[in-house]
């Protein structure tokens, strides 16, 4: 039987039927919709309930509406029923509108709902567009993954946006997203190796709270869409954006006043007290006349990644700190400082004053804690959304900072990391998912209410929090430094600039002019035997690549650990000139790069170059750091933009120290030319 969509168009090949998984003898299984199959699984503490284990399946239809009902399970009982509802769409896809289970007689909790699980065809060349970092195209070696194993899983933390896709050249690609109020819940997206050769499974996953009521009966509290389509990562991001921008929370976020952030030409991510952090800001503004935003780390009276959340007072004293803020602002700078809104040092003596009552706990009672600082060896425990003691400390801190004259604060780890299920028995919320997101949203809103007009930012974009933060830092223009892999297997793509454009400002990179990581004097004596200058000089292209890549993506430029020592270093003369030129180019082209719309990537031909990158960090000596290699990096980066008045242009940058030629095909308009070393070019389409 063929089904008609409500519009009257035939839903492409929408033949719905029950069938058994290849190689299995189950009496019930998935639902076929066209060329894909739709099923579910429910993960419990001990095992997984799968649709293939159910005793019967009935499928009913009404116009474009499909209802699948599975009944009976060997463990959950004969009365166990799972019902899924889908609405077929003209393109051959469907909206998953409802999923519910009931009648579970077994004493097992449902810890994860996975629906829909959409089995689609693939080839060995199929790539995955996944919502990690800024967006990523991952080209797996499918031979390395066993049937039913995750090939790629995104979330619950670091879920940059709510869609995923399987990409095919010359055949249909496959898109899956989360809609409705998914952002308020503990969710993930995954791609699994398929049940038969030549298949993969797109999965939406949800971790519900664990209660007696939800053990017996529960379901998905949101909807989403599966769609076959023609195209790649850009079309997938655009599809999700087309829904997101219709939501009231997106419209409210986009209506905010971003004018103060729009005036920024470059960010400086500084680490140190007043004597380290203030002079470079004045130097750059004097040299260029451009506005600098200082993202100030290590202003606090405690060692970094240690003794959180007791940041106050500043290490230069309250008066010295406030005087420095005033001097920078009087000369036109934007100033914000680092705070951590989500972690408490569980090895600090003050942990006993409320840490356990505030913390996220994993199943079994362990803290969700990590040691970042290898010198102090203190662990930071992640904090739940139900944490009045911790939140009270942070709220007072942010008030102190606003009263110090700052433009805003950065609240680390919330947007990227406040998504975990929590099982702390001291908390009033049900164990499991959803409590952390709801608690953190209320907490961040309270900070906003306490500090009207204060600009808040956090780490990474997420649909859960983007409407509460005006800005987000993303460091993945420094892809290799962050250890994210090499082309062609792992390719960063600027999907965030498609999904969030106009509703949240994105800034950031790890581009470090001198190349050396910073050292906090409060950690103690710096380790000996690290010949930094001799090592970092071996990576001459890294700074320009990292700085320019983000600008091309529409991310506000940032330099990391830029000090007056860099100004005096003759090795860096060309890099610092490129830094000035890049900030000026970004500022002069904000009608495209800040206000405009990122278009589908054009085709550009240019030479490639082998480039080595040093993956150094504060917690690893330079000589012990890893070198990442891009064997064939394009020497000209590019992106295409449409301004609000309809003008279209390509942004081009030659990050190398040699002149580079290029050929550009911009939607049928062909351009060619050359770009001098370390320079930018705006190529108008018409």
Which residues are covered by each model-predicted region?
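Active-site-proximal substrate-binding groove within the catalytic cores of carbohydrate-active enzymes
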Residues: 212-220, 397, 433-670, 676-677, ...
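Bacterial N-terminal signal peptides that target proteins for export
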Residues: 2-13
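Bacterial N-terminal signal peptides
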Residues: 12-20
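Aromatic- and glycine-enriched glycan-recognition loops and surfaces
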Residues: 262-362, 391-395, 435-445
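Sec/Tat signal peptide C-region and signal peptidase I cleavage site
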Residues: 22-24
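Polysaccharide-binding and catalytic clefts of secreted carbohydrate-active enzymes
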Residues: 147-157, 171-172, 280-283, 293, ...
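Active-site-adjacent "subsite" loops/lids of carbohydrate-active enzymes
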Residues: 320-322, 326-327, 334-404, 478-498
């Amino acid at each position: 039987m063929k089904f008609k969509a409500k519009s009257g168009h035939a839903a492409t090949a929408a033949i719905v039927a029950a069938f058994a998984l290849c190689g299995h003898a189950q009496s019930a299984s998935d639902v076929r919709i066209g060329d894909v199959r739709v099923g579910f699984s429910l993960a419990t503490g001990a095992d997984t309930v799968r649709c293939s284990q159910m005793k019967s399946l009935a499928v009913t239809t009404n116009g474009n509406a499909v209802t699948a009902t599975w009944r009976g399970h060997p463990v959950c009982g004969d009365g166990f029923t799972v019902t899924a509802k889908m609405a077929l769409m003209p393109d051959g896809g469907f909206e998953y509108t409802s999923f519910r289970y009931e009648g579970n007689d077994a004493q097992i909790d449902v810890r994860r709902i996975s629906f829909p699980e959409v089995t689609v065809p693939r080839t060995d060349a199929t790539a995955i567009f996944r919502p990690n970092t800024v967006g990523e195209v991952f080209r797996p070696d499918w031979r390395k993954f066993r049937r039913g194993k995750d090939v790629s899983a995104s979330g619950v933390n670091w879920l940059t946006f709510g869609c995923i896709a399987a990409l095919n050249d010359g055949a249909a690609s496959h898109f899956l997203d989360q809609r409705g109020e998914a952002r308020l819940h503990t969710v993930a997206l995954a791609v699994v190796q398929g049940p038969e050769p030549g298949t993969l499974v797109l999965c939406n996953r949800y971790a519900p709270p664990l209660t007696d009521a939800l053990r017996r009966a529960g379901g998905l509290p949101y909807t989403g869409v599966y769609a076959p389509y023609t195209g790649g990562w850009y079309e997938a991001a655009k599809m999700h954006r087309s829904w997101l921008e219709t939501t009231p929370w997106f419209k409210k976020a986009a209506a905010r006043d971003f004018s103060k952030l729009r005036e920024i030409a470059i960010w400086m991510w500084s680490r140190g007290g007043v004597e380290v952090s203030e002079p470079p800001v004045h130097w750059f503004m004097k040299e260029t006349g451009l506005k600098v935003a200082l993202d100030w780390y290590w202003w606090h009276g405690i060692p970094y990644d240690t003794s959180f959340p007791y940041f106050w007072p500043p290490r230069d004293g309250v008066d010295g700190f406030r005087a420095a803020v005033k001097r920078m602002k009087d000369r036109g700078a934007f100033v914000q400082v680092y705070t951590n809104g989500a972690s408490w040092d569980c090895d600090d003596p003050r942990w006993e004053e409320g840490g356990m009552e505030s913390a996220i706990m994993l199943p079994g009672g362990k803290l969700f804690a990590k040691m970042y600082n290898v010198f102090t060896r203190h662990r930071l425990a992640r904090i739940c959304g139900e944490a009045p003691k911790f939140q009270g400390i942070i709220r007072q801190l942010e008030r102190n900072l606003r009263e110090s004259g700052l433009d805003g604060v950065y609240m680390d780890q919330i947007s990227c990391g406040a998504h975990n299920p929590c099982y702390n028995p001291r908390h009033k919320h049900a164990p499991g998912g959803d409590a952390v997101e709801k608690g953190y949203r209320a907490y961040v809103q309270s900070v906003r209410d306490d500090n009207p007009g204060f600009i808040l930012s956090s780490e990474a974009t997420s649909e859960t929090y983007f409407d509460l933060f005006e800005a987000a830092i993303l460091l993945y223009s420094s892809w290799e430094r962050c250890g994210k892999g090499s082309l062609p297997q792992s390719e960063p793509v600027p999907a965030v600039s498609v999904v969030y454009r106009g509703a949240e400002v994105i800034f950031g990179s790890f581009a470090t002019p001198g190349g050396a990581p910073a050292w906090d004097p409060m950690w103690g004596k710096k380790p000996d035997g690290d010949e930094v200058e001799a090592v970092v000089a071996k990576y001459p292209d890294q700074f320009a690549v990292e700085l320019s890549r983000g600008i091309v993506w529409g991310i506000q430029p940032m330099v990391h650990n830029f000090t007056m020592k860099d100004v005096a270093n003759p090795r860096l003369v060309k890099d610092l000139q490129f830094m000035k030129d890049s900030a000026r180019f970004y500022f002069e082209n904000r009608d495209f790069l800040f206000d405009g719309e990122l278009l589908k990537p054009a085709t550009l031909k240019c030479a490639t170059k082998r480039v080595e990158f040093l993956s150094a960090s504060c917690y690893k000596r330079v000589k012990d750091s890893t070198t990442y290699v891009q064997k064939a990096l394009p020497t000209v980066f590019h992106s295409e933009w449409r301004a609000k008045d309809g003008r279209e242009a390509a942004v081009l940058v030659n990050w190398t120290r040699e002149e580079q030629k290029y050929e550009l095909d911009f939607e049928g308009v062909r351009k060619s030319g050359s770009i001098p070393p370390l320079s930018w070019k705006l190529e108008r389409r018409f």
